A protein has these predicted regions:
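Generic beta-strand structural signal
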Residues: 116, 153-155, 264-266
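Short glycine/threonine-rich beta-strand-turn micro-motifs
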Residues: 157-164
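A eukaryote-biased signal for long
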Residues: 220-297
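Intrinsically disordered, low-complexity polar/charged tails and linkers
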Residues: 1-152, 166-167, 172-175, 183-238, ...
Length: 297
């Protein structure tokens, strides 16, 4: 956003003024080494970057640097549909009834908006997270920072996915959707067989396996990692083949031109990417992978 909208000479002069410097030998390095707070100051001094440009950039990359989600079953006892506006009204009403500790680590879960893509509702939310620190006087204090998160509701396919939500708030949302849809909301456990069916073992680069009751001469947990792991399976000691996979990473093709590292937390049903994507890329990839997982069952 900075490079595309501000002339290089202006970037240099404004940033040097903020930093109290007179010159730089490498403008690109200078910009890339700055903190978020400094870059915000630069944007605030740059009328070229309008509110609409900021809003557009936010919408494009709204899912963050490492986008992902935790996937839940929504096992319904009856078929119940809720229109978009009714869904928005009910979740706002529910959130208004929640109570939090004044000094709690997470609090003030609030509704932001609801949009629909395909047959999925995306509910955007925000909450406050507490960060403790020592101030300039050496005193312990804290500050609350607003965090954004979202819920994808694919009730027609019996799933709900949540992003960037701490467990204590996630549990509150699970209760809400359980009551709203008369559904049992449970984590999808990603089993060894599901991994074999949905993801290519040729693309695996890191695997952690666990056995709570291992043979006497074997480890309880083992992690193997290599950029060419599929070519080096013979290096793994025998006896661990039937252990449960708890965490794994793959080289993942996101679309025809983009690849990244996909991480899978099997017990929690959590998938995440180590690559920043546009909103459309992430939604398209997520929908495909969710359908792959749901389709397995």
């Amino acid at each position: 956003m900075i490079w595309n909208n501000i002339e290089k000479e202006l970037i240099e002069s404004r940033l040097l003024q903020i930093k109290g410097q007179s010159t730089t030998s490498d403008l690109t390095k200078l910009v890339n080494s700055q903190s978020r707070a400094t870059l915000i100051q630069l944007i605030e001094r740059s009328p070229e970057i309008t509110v609409s440009i900021i809003d557009s950039a936010y919408e494009k990359y709204r899912y963050g640097l490492k986008p992902g989600f935790t996937l839940f079953w929504a096992k319904r006892t009856s078929i119940k549909t809720v229109p978009q506006q009714e869904l928005a009204n009910k979740i706002q009403e529910y959130l208004s009834t929640l109570h939090y500790d004044n000094d709690g680590k997470y609090k003030n879960l609030e509704y932001c908006s609801t949009v629909k893509f395909g047959d999925i509702y995306e509910i955007s939310l925000s909450y406050l997270q507490r960060f403790n620190y020592i101030n300039a006087d050496g005193e312990f204090t804290f500050i609350y920072m607003m965090k954004e998160c979202f819920v994808w509701v694919g009730i027609n396919k019996n799933f709900i996915a949540m992003n960037n939500i701490p467990e204590v708030l996630m549990n509150s949302l699970k209760k809400f959707f359980s009551r709203l849809y008369s559904a049992d909301i449970t984590n999808i456990k990603i089993t060894n067989k599901l991994l074999e069916k949905v993801f290519s073992s040729d693309n695996a680069k890191r695997v952690t396996k666990h056995n709570s009751n291992p043979p006497e001469n074997q480890l309880e947990k083992i992690t193997v990692a290599d950029s060419r792991l599929s070519e080096k399976l013979s290096c793994i000691p025998a006896g661990y083949e039937d252990y449960d996979v708890t965490n794994t990473q793959y080289i993942e093709e996101i679309d025809g031109t983009t690849t990244g590292t996909l991480g899978v937390n099997c017990n929690k049903g959590k998938l995440y990417l180590s690559k920043s994507l546009t909103s459309s890329q992430f939604r398209t990839w997520s929908t495909r992978r969710i359908n792959d997982i749901i389709g397995y069952f």
